[in-house]
């Protein structure tokens, strides 16, 4: 199992916990609003909006909240904010590369919160381009196994452009080019296979192996960054062994 897959497992489990507590709702709502503003308010003609809505539904965001966000983004209802996407780069403990994607209506606030979280948790900000070259943009789909084998999933998505199917233990992760994400997701639907999320995500080309102490420090940094309302996603190239993940999750 590669480093990014292990980290995806950690993020996936954390996302489920956060959703149950309602912590993720605001970020999911922002994604819907921005997707509707960028590509129109019809999910049928806007794949990014469709995926944002599906992800929100999977996380139990109330339908009324989803619909209001869609309308705000599409201009059908007043109250939409002027969201801006900003990416910050840095290094965490043990030299782990960190990409931080923000969606904010206040650049100064976002920059300040990211900087504080980094410096208080063993991280350092880096110049643009000094970290991002270690990552590539990929389409990432996660789905629960539900009795499916890796071959079942691979057969459904291979011709649609899937590059890799990885077994994450309780779930599968499908990697594709971002441009093939909709085709792969549609192939799953055509095969009657349900999925949890479909996103364009950063995947590391080189990973940094961590021991238990290093993993604990990096996860503390990621938690601090994700506590900011302006931070949408945090990506690292940490490679955390399964046994250490199990210790940290106890």
Swiss-Prot record:
Please give one Gene Ontology molecular function term for this protein.
DNA binding
Q: Which Pfam families match?
A: TACO1_YebC_N, Transcrip_reg
What Gene3D superfamilies has UniProt attached to this entry? 1.10.10.200, 3.30.70.980
> Could you state one GO biological process linked to this protein?
regulation of DNA-templated transcription
Q: Does the keyword Cytoplasm apply?
A: yes
Q: Does the keyword Transcription apply?
A: yes
Entry's family note: Belongs to the TACO1 family.
State the GO CC annotations: cytosol
Protein location: Cytoplasm
> Keywords assigned by UniProt?
Cytoplasm, DNA-binding, Transcription, Transcription regulation
Protein name as it appears in the record: Probable transcriptional regulatory protein Mkms_2298
UniProt main location, coarse: cytoplasm
- Native organism is Mycobacterium sp. (strain KMS)
């Amino acid at each position: 199992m590669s480093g990014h897959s292990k980290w995806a497992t950690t993020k996936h489990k954390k996302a489920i916990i956060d959703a149950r507590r309602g912590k993720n709702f605001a970020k999911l709502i922002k994604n819907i609003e921005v997707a509707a503003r960028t590509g129109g308010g019809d999910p049928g003609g806007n794949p990014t909006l469709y995926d944002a809505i599906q992800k929100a539904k999977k996380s139990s965001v109330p339908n009324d909240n989803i619909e209001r966000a869609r309308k705000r983004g599409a201009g059908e209802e007043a109250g939409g904010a002027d969201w801006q996407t900003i990416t910050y780069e840095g290094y965490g403990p043990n030299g782990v590369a960190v990409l931080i994607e923000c969606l904010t209506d206040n650049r100064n606030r976002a920059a300040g919160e990211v900087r504080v979280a980094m410096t208080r948790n063993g991280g350092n900000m880096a110049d643009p381009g000094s970290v991002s070259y270690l990552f590539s943009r990929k389409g990432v789909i996660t789905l629960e196994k539900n009795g499916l084998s890796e071959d079942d999933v691979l057969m459904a998505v291979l011709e649609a452009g899937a590059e890799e199917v990885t077994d994450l233990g309780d779930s599968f992760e499908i990697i594709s080019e971002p441009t093939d994400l909709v085709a792969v997701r549609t192939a799953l639907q055509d095969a009657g296979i349900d999925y949890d999320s479909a996103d364009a995500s950063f995947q590391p080309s080189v990973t940094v192996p961590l021991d238990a102490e290093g993993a604990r420090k990096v996860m503390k940094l990621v938690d601090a960054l994700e506590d900011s309302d302006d931070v949408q996603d945090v990506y690292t190239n940490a490679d955390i062994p399964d046994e250490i993940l199990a210790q940290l999750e106890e």
